[in-house]
Swiss-Prot record:
Cysteines paired by S-S bonds: none
Subcellular location(s) per record: Cell outer membrane; Cell surface
InterPro entries (alphabetical): OM_lipoprot_Borrelia, OM_lipoprot_dom_sf
Residues with a covalently attached lipid (N-palmitoyl cysteine): 17
Signal peptide: 1-16
Name of the protein in question: Outer surface protein A
Amino acid sequence: MKKYLLGIGLILALIACKQNVSSLDEKNSVSVDLPGGMTVLVSKEKDKDGKYSLDATVDKLELKGTSDKNNGSGTLEGEKTDKSKVKLTIADDLSQTKFEIFKEDGKTLVSKKVTLKDKSSTEEKFNEKGETSEKTIVRANGTRLEYTDIKSDGSGKAKEVLKDFTLEGTLAADGKTTLKVTEGTVVLSKNILKSGEITVALDDSDTTQATKKTGNWDSKSSTLTISVNSQKTKNLVFTKEDTITVQKYDSAGTNLEGKAVEITTLKELKAALK
């Protein structure tokens, strides 16, 4: 009889344990929105260990975890069909999420994506040596910087995807991004330093002084003033919204005329360099 009761008790304990780790639903949890369009379910009550249960589904993969807080912060983990491990870390103040994928050993990082509340994000992919091989930085306004073929020294290919067109260039080992547009003898270079500071330069290989173009960059107004034979012809403004506008000077090169017009195609940008 004692063995029978002991067996019943063990079965009930297993059932209780199973219920404790079962998926959360709208009845026993609260839904919390996270940066990156993700949602986490937080249990309304603490478990037997005094912690709140967390449940989230990312890319059709169910992740589970626990937290001392009931606001949605904490760490959730899961495993993909290929045995690779997934980890989602939610900041205490819900200001950012970090989504990581590891190899089967749970230590070797395959990829990492950090997303902030303003919808900006940084995503990295890693090679066998654990070095960054690809990187994508998405700004809050949706424009982004894409880095590929990153070598051990940090250099690689670069691409800036703006609202309507794309600029291409290189990433230097010191973290400087250089994006170039060429039109005839003129080369426009947009440089983005590791700190985020932007500078723009114009070089012209034309040897005829009367038609040779020069550029003067004003960092305060983010404006490149283009001149021909020392006479101003137009302004290119690189706005905080990551757009480019063009406005011409009068024939004397002293006053701007008309209104600044947003450049929406690469063809229009090249035309502004003529």
